[in-house]
Amino acid sequence: MADVVLGIETSCDETSAAVLVNGELASLVILSQDVHKVFGGVVPELASRAHLTALPRVVDRALAEAGLAPASIDAVAVTAGPGLAGALLVGVVYAKSFAYAGDRALIGVHHMEGHLFAPAVEDRQLAPPFVALLVSGGHTLLLDVPAWGHYRLLGQTRDDAAGEAFDKVATLLGLGYPGGPAIETLARAGDPGRFSFPRPMIADGFEFSFSGLKTAVLHAVRASPDLERDRASLARGFQDAVLDVLVTKLERAVVATGYTTAVLGGGVACSRALSGLAAQRLGARGGARVAVASPRLNADNAAMIARAGWYHLRLGERSDWTLDARADLPLPGLEMTVTTHPSLRSGQAPARRTDFS
């Protein structure tokens, strides 16, 4: 039984390690890479090199904060994809080496499944069925989750992810990277009625599109006679449009499924404006509960990877030594069971349980 799990996350620009003991978080270390800020976005080669340097120290610190020696680790869970290929490879190679050296179990985890499990790190009573909105720099996914390990894709973005749109609009407004926190801070001082931007596809099913909204902001920026005066209101108008679309789709999914719980996950879920609007509108619609993790668990982190890995390990699932990083690792869609990685040994999906609390 894998009671002590080391989680490793290196999919983008955070180097993270965490230790989970019997499902409880014992330690979490996240080292952010500040080197990218000057470029206004993540430089893949720099990210890979930074992970190479930082990961051994981050793992050592996570073990020390948990008060455990390496020999205490039963299993290693690592993000196998999707993400930046080089960055993922650093984590996967380290995890395989650590696991092999101690004859430990190894499990590859899908990054977005990690985000799905993030609220369960703090709320062990969280259990399906629920609707999940996972919003990050690379993904915008709306899922029907009838049980852990079973994910039905309701909708996703057709172009830019919501987090990507925030980063690009932040650049247009002369703000820093990452764009989401910068826009949210600036938007608090903006006039919500000054700029009204389109809500793309807001009336159309569960799909998303943010490219046209980004273009509308670009035109407004170019047309502004005083950008310094308008910057905060532009940020507010853009943020209001994105959040309105996200929450409207989430509301629609809750109604369609009849579920009483909605989960928010991913880096964009760090936004208090998003979680607040979702709680307000879903609460007004009959008391549906919104489950969202604390900001440090919504950002990329190893605790969520350890939690997802712990779930799969308790089902007897393992990855073999052919585990490899996949930048495009897919999250299976309608009626398909998400697997942690194609190298899982079991040829038949085991029965799923929902009571691992």
Where are these regions (language model features)?
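Acidic, glycine-enriched active-site microenvironments
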Residues: 1-345, 349-357
